[in-house]
UniProtKB/Swiss-Prot annotation:
<feature type="binding site">
    <location>
        <position position="707"/>
    </location>
    <ligand>
        <name>ATP 2</name>
    </ligand>
</feature>
<dbReference type="Pfam" id="PF02786">
    <property type="entry name" value="CPSase_L_D2"/>
</dbReference>
<comment type="pathway">
    <text>Pyrimidine metabolism; UMP biosynthesis via de novo pathway; (S)-dihydroorotate from bicarbonate: step 1/3.</text>
</comment>
<dbReference type="InterPro" id="IPR011607">
    <property type="entry name" value="MGS-like_dom"/>
</dbReference>
<feature type="binding site">
    <location>
        <position position="208"/>
    </location>
    <ligand>
        <name>ATP 1</name>
    </ligand>
</feature>
<feature type="binding site">
    <location>
        <position position="210"/>
    </location>
    <ligand>
        <name>ATP 1</name>
    </ligand>
</feature>
<feature type="binding site">
    <location>
        <position position="820"/>
    </location>
    <ligand>
        <name>Mn(2+) 3</name>
    </ligand>
</feature>
<keyword id="KW-0547">Nucleotide-binding</keyword>
<feature type="binding site">
    <location>
        <position position="298"/>
    </location>
    <ligand>
        <name>Mn(2+) 2</name>
    </ligand>
</feature>
<dbReference type="InterPro" id="IPR036897">
    <property type="entry name" value="CarbamoylP_synth_lsu_oligo_sf"/>
</dbReference>
<dbReference type="InterPro" id="IPR006275">
    <property type="entry name" value="CarbamoylP_synth_lsu"/>
</dbReference>
<comment type="similarity">
    <text>Belongs to the CarB family.</text>
</comment>
<feature type="binding site">
    <location>
        <position position="284"/>
    </location>
    <ligand>
        <name>ATP 1</name>
    </ligand>
</feature>
<protein>
    <recommendedName>
        <fullName>Carbamoyl phosphate synthase large chain</fullName>
        <ecNumber>6.3.4.16</ecNumber>
        <ecNumber>6.3.5.5</ecNumber>
    </recommendedName>
</protein>
<feature type="binding site">
    <location>
        <position position="298"/>
    </location>
    <ligand>
        <name>Mn(2+) 1</name>
    </ligand>
</feature>
<feature type="region of interest" description="Carbamoyl phosphate synthetic domain">
    <location>
        <begin position="547"/>
        <end position="929"/>
    </location>
</feature>
<dbReference type="InterPro" id="IPR033937">
    <property type="entry name" value="MGS_CPS_CarB"/>
</dbReference>
């Protein structure tokens, strides 16, 4: 049926900040949906709290609201805008939960708003574990034996009947939050308690564990006419028991017989029809490898992480079509945008293999528990495409950017068989590498299958790779062996090491022998129809399908997988850069490997290469395309790290030159440049040995800030207060030597300021200056940022502007630069300069209306700032106040300390904007998930060095009517200041103690700045973790606490007796 004409305005709900379980895939689906609805002539209103997205650009929708995704704010927008309908199914779990909340509150009925796409009843049937189980029983679809529970007693009842292990799945949660597998009573108590807490309806499904079955996913679409198709089916290499977001996934499925494939396909279609879903939907199934017995695990009645992967794997744009279906169009009316000839009701066919490997944050969090289970832990993922599974897997491995070029890790070589067995049974992020190591050491496929039930087909593929390694090592210099190895996806890096040559020598050897890859097109139809998409992958085959045009081209390097420190902000900059290249009349080519992002949507660039970002893979494309040059500024550290190698290959780096990039990153050169420019910086030196480090720290004086050079996201950065901590750091955090020096700086406790600027070498334009609420020492990505700065004097601002202009010109920056300053005793010091796009580019671009990545790209391509209408100087400040607040995923990562410091820990960000700082802060904090009740209790436990400062904070909490709780030491200090306080027992007390108060929800805030110590056993760590597990705001910085107090004070009316008021007035007269 044709599209609906009875609705005009549609409100699209975004997915909010990036957290583990909900990453950039919703920026991609939301952006697609908004464009798709606008194409059909609807007025689109978007609400989302995440400023780092393409989706929240003003051009994406007719009206964009960057506001908290809470009932209070979304209801306000609905009442103001009066949309005819809302579309929640493209905003992930956040969007779905919001729709349910809006419907229950009555605001949709009150304003006459209907829910498009998937009806509320279908959302509830799929998300509510009880209703879903009933529906499956009605359809005669098998589900594992299970029971809905609402408390621990009911859980015991089920386990007594069915036995361990059992899987706990909380209702209405994201990425398996709060769930897990229980093997014994202790785990049952812990996981069920946590699951009930995380479920908004206090409901969990307990099911008999079917771990060990194959996990298969079907991505299906259905329209209002009941046409339904399978877009893509995928198979998890890891059997059931590991969350699909943490599994290595291949598409299409590799081990299903036709009968199994058709059986599961029919089931998936039957379920989507029974639920009445209109749009995209993801069905997860478990298949017993030894019989035709299968189980339905769950259904996501929305666009999901898997649908982003399916879209990129097949080229079939699910979100775009789901939006069209939501407004009444049917699959046989929608033209497939890939072929532009066939209709969307054709099921895609693949003539290649796609692999997805998750990217975990364990390189950042050494203390995290690396075991994988039903609760997701990955922050992002990479995808690769090959003609065979071996090639596809090895390309994915080198896309992860962990410095790994092959399916082997040096530190696993020492493992004995028993350790390998344990780790393969348990499943962690290195399982596939351990499987390869076990095969190298002669463990049979039968044994490995017995340990982890990974299918023999996949084990055979790993064995093929291991056998090929032996061939390579035994046949040094043999061209035929080299050809076979390349067809299997082996990297030059690996072959060079085996043949004792350099990577460059192998590359040149292949070039001489015409052993270069060709590029194949992703066309959704296995080349049956001609395709109009410029979307390519490399492989070693005969025919090259990537036609080089005679237009001048520019290559942009993307930023790879989403991880802590390198989030969606860099993808935002990449996309804007590509658009600017097109506007300037060049052909824009993008190289990236992240299936979740907007940049890897084939409609963004003129050509998209889905490839690993390694020197070998990038050079293959450059050799073919021969571009004018490569832009590395927008791909975060990933792209910057490739610059030197590209230049060695004779490739032109556009924008800031390699020499100037190096001057900003290399400590000694940078110091020399600052001295020459007369710009002060904290005293600091470089150490290349442990002894040197100790001597430097003594000379500068503690506390010192230590870090390796060339890092992103403050990896392995620490503030050290005494010598033993320094020695611990030098031994455990870094391997120091001449090539990898460690920087040691005087740590200044001052106000941190961040500036983004654009320079063309002559002019330097500054769109905005941001002030951090947390003082220097907390990573800028984890600080609350405020624009415009609220407490800088005009004199300091002028100093900052002067320094920024001097640095832009003095370092010969062409393009973007980001500078971090610290204000200490009324003097401005430079902490660091990053000659590239920063995390704050999207935030400042949205606020100031200066499209920074676009302007910078045009500068890089030779159009100076004056030609573009900008000159040297500072952009006029906006009237409103904007706050950027960090969002953390601690609830998903047990045993990670939540204390903020110089190493970045947040996964995402939100924006709050309003007329005053307090209101903007309120929005930012609420959007980031912090509850701000106007009364209640606050627990204060602070280190001795913070006691004095904490007194003033405690007094203010008391003034607004908060009840203060503290352990003996802190309580004594409070009593001395005449501040009423209730003493609570320390956590090692057998009696009712501090942790019990947190567990029972009797504290609204916990302020905890306990002594530094990296061993998690410390008291402070336990207090902080308990707060996270129980959803209580735990503040580890007194600056953040002050910000929250400002908000609370602005929300509460003061209450003083008349006597108090007159007494203070009398004192004023006396002292006059």
């Amino acid at each position: 049926m044709p599209k609906r004409l009875d609705i005009n305005t549609i409100l699209v709900i975004g997915s909010g900040p990036i957290v583990i379980g909900q990453a950039a895939e919703f920026d991609y689906s939301g952006t697609q949906a908004c464009q798709s609805l606008k194409e059909e002539g609807y007025k689109v209103i978007l609400v989302n709290s995440n400023p780092a997205t393409i989706m929240t650009d003003t051009a994406t929708a007719d009206k964009v609201y960057i506001e908290p995704l809470t009932l209070e704010f979304v209801s306000r927008i609905i009442r103001k805008e009066r949309p005819d309908a809302i579309l929640p199914t493209l905003g992930g779990q956040t969007g779905l939960n919001m729709a349910v909340e809006l419907a229950k509150s009555g605001v949709l009925d009150e304003c006459g708003v209907e829910i498009l796409g998937t009806k509320l009843s279908a959302i509830e049937q799929a998300e509510d574990r009880d209703l879903f189980r009933t529906l499956m029983q009605d359809l005669n679809e098998p589900t594992p034996p299970s029971e809905i529970i609402h408390n621990l007693d009911e859980a015991y009842g089920f386990v007594n009947e069915i036995g361990y292990p059992v899987i706990v799945r909380p209702a209405f949660t994201l990425g398996g939050t709060g769930g897990g597998i229980c093997h014994n009573e202790e785990e049952l108590i812990e996981i069920v308690t946590s699951g009930l807490k995380h479920s908004p309806v206090t409901q969990c499904l307990l099911e008999k564990s079917i771990a060990g079955c194959k996990e298969i996913e079907y991505e299906v679409m259905r329209d209002s006419n009941d046409n339904a198709i399978v877009v893509c089916n995928m198979e998890n290499i890891d059997p059931v028991g590991v969350h699909t977001g943490d599994s290595i996934v291949v598409a299409p499925s590799q081990t299903l017989s036709d009968r199994e494939y058709q059986m599961l396909r029919n089931t998936s279609l039957r379920i989507i029809r029974a639920l009445g879903i209109e749009g995209g939907c993801n069905v997860q199934l478990a298949l017993d490898p030894y019989s035709f017995q299968y189980y339905v695990i769950e259904v996501n009645p929305r666009v999901s992480r898997s649908s982003a992967l399916a879209s990129k794997a097949t080229g079939y744009p699910i979100a775009k079509l789901a939006a069209k279906i939501a407004v009444g169009l049917t699959l046989d009316e929608i033209v497939n945008p890939v072929t532009q000839k066939t209709y969307a009701c054709f099921e895609p066919a693949l003539d290649y293999v796609v692999s997805k490997i998750p990217r975990w944050p364990f390189d950042k969090f050494e203390s995290a528990n690396r075991t994988l289970g039903t609760q997701m832990k990955a922050t992002g993922e990479v995808m690769s495409i090959g003609r065979n599974l071996e090639e596809s897997l090895l390309k994915a491995v080198r896309s992860l950017e962990l410095g790994i070029y092959h399916l082997e890790l040096d530190h696993l070589k020492e493992l004995d068989k028993e350790t390998m067995k344990k780790r393969i049974i348990k499943a962690d992020d290195e399982r596939l590498f351990i499987v390869a190591e076990a095969i190298r050491q002669g463990v049979t496929k039968e044994e490995i299958n017995e340990w982890c039930e990974m299918d023999f087909f996949f084990l055979q593929k790993v064995e093929n790779i291991v056998n090929m390694e032996r061939e390579v090592k035994a046949n040094v210099g043999n061209m035929e062996v080299l050809q076979t190895a390349k067809e299997m996806g082996f990297s030059d890096h690996y072959i060079a090491a085996a043949w004792n040559k350099t990577e460059r020598e192998i590359y040149d050897m292949r070039k001489e022998n015409n052993m270069m890859p060709v590029f194949k097109m992703v066309d959704t139809c296995a080349a049956e129809f001609e395709s109009a998409t410029p979307y390519y992958y490399s492989t070693y085959a005969d025919e090259n399908e990537s036609i080089v045009t005679d237009r001048k081209s520019v290559v942009v390097l993307g930023s790879g997988p989403i991880r802590i420190g390198q989030g969606v902000e860099f993808d935002y900059a990449t996309v804007h850069s590509v658009w600017a290249i097109k506007e300037a009349g060049y052909e824009a080519i993008i190289i990236n490997n992240n299936p979740e992002t907007v940049s890897t949507d084939f409609s963004i660039s003129d050509k998209l290469y889905f490839e690993p970002l390694t020197i070998e893979d990038v050079m293959h494309i450059i050799d073919l395309e021969k571009p004018e040059g490569v832009i590395v500024q927008f791909g975060g550290q990933t792209a910057i790290n490739l610059a030197a190698k590209l230049e060695e290959h004779g490739v032109k780096i556009l924008g800031t030159s390699l020499e100037d990039l190096d001057r900003a990153e290399d400590r000694d050169k940078f110091e020399a440049a600052l001295t020459k420019l007369g710009i002060p910086q904290p005293v600091g030196k470089t150490a290349t040995t442990v002894e040197q480090a100790v001597a430097i720290a003594e000379e500068i004086g503690y506390p010192v800030l230590v870090r390796p050079s060339y890092v992103l996201g403050g990896r392995a950065m620490e503030i050290v207060y005494r010598q033993e901590e320094l020695l611990h750091y030098m031994k455990n955090a870094v391997k120091v030597h001449a090539d990898h020096p460690v920087l040691i700086d005087r740590y200044m406790v001052g106000k941190e300021i961040e500036v983004d600027a654009i320079s063309d070498g002559e002019n330097v334009f500054i769109p905005g200056i941001m002030e951090h609420i947390e003082r220097a020492g907390v990573h800028s990505g984890d600080s609350i940022g405020v624009y415009p700065p609220q407490s800088l004097s005009e004199k300091l601002k002028e100093q900052i502007i002067e320094h920024t202009i001097a640095l832009g010109k003095g370092l010969n920056i062409v393009g973007l630069l980001n500078i971090q300053f610290v204000v200490f005793k009324d003097q401005v010091y430079v902490i660091e300069v990053n000659p590239r796009a920063s995390r704050t580019v999207p935030f400042l671009s949205k606020i100031t209306g200066v499209p920074m990545a676009n302007v910078a790209t045009k500068v890089i391509l030779g159009q100076d700032l004056v030609e573009q209408g900008y000159g040297t100087g500072y952009h006029p400040e906006e009237k409103e106040v904007y706050v950027k607040a960090p969002v953390f995923s601690f609830a998903k990562l047990r045993s990670v300390d939540t204390t903020l410091g110089p190493e970045m820990k947040s996964t995402g960000e939100v924006m709050g904007k309003d007329l005053t700082l307090e209101k903007a802060l309120y929005k930012g904090l609420v959007a980031s998930g912090i509850n701000i009740p106007t009364h209640g209790s606050v627990i204060i436990t602070v280190a001795d060095k913070d006691k004095e400062e904490a007194m003033e904070i405690a007094k203010r909490f008391h003034e607004i009517g908060y009840n203060l709780l503290a352990t003996a030491g802190t309580a004594q200090s409070l009593e001395e200041q005449n501040i009423p306080v209730q003493v609570v027992n320390k956590i090692d007390s057998e009696d009712y103690n501090l942790l019990d108060i947190i567990r029972q929800g009797k504290a609204q805030f916990v302020i905890n700045t306990l002594t530094k110590g990296k061993q998690p056993a410390r008291d402070g760590f336990r207090i902080r973790r308990e707060s996270v597990e129980n959803g209580v705001a735990c503040l580890t910085s007194l600056d953040t606490t002050r910000a929250i107090l400002r908000v609370l004070e602005s929300m509460t009316f003061s209450a003083h007796s008349m006597k108090e008021i007159t007494q203070t007035k009398r004192h004023e007269v006396v002292h006059a």
